[in-house]
Amino acid sequence: MLNPWRAWASDTDSTIGKGAIVNAKQLGPKLDFASIQGYETREDAIIYEIHVRDFTSDHDISETLQAEFGTFASFIEKLDYIKNLGVTHIQLLPVMSYYFIDELNRDRILNYTSANNNYNWGYDPHSYFSLSGMYSQDPRNPELRIIEFKNLIQEIHNRGMGVTMDVVYNHTAQMHILEDIEPNYYHFMNLDASPRESFGGGRLGTTHAMSRRLLIDSICYFTEVFKIDGFRFDMMGDHDATTIQNAFDAKKSHQPECFNDW
């Protein structure tokens, strides 16, 4: 059983979850929110959605990379390409820890495959506070992924672009992730008193006090520690309106000019 508020989690052997006690605020560079020239309202946003691993996975650019392909570190090496497109915000597909992946398998997928591979968009969340080790140069190091992600955010901000995160709070990858902590509480419930499923996992019951707090605390954590400029909610309609408004208000209390792509 893993603490859902933990800041680092890993399942590198696909069998046993792991946790570490870290102080993310003390790791990596000191960050601030982006200052974006010409960006006044959300209608001014030019958003580039991108998968961290895909961005540098092309074999043709492998010899130009100093860092391992598909990582936060190699992403930095190609940031100028995005900047030259006139982008205001880089929207990262889910970077929080996700479930169905072997973080130690770094093989490049060169041929088309739709199943039985080690490729994942990240829409199967394992934790709402920890980062995926798939994008770290050493997934065994619980602190490195935090430092590398902060470095990426700093470099994006240094180029006058904002960072928005694609977040998946509507469900978890597996029912037991939250059911093991408190049965029949963290999820919305069916009429037969069983927890409601969604995409094979549990559908987060945001009308329940601690489920709502889990979501809002996660927003605040990534806002305070990583200075994320905005969030894109996956399947936002699965949440109740009060929770979404509270999440927006919490974000805005830290960053009045926040951008929320929901």
Q: Where on the chain are the PLM-derived regions?
A:
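The feature marks proteins involved in alpha-glucan
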Residues: M1-I47, T56-E63, A67
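Substrate-binding/active-site clefts of carbohydrate-active enzymes
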Residues: R53-F226, M235, T243-C258, W262
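Active-site capping/gating regions of soluble enzymes
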Residues: G230-F231
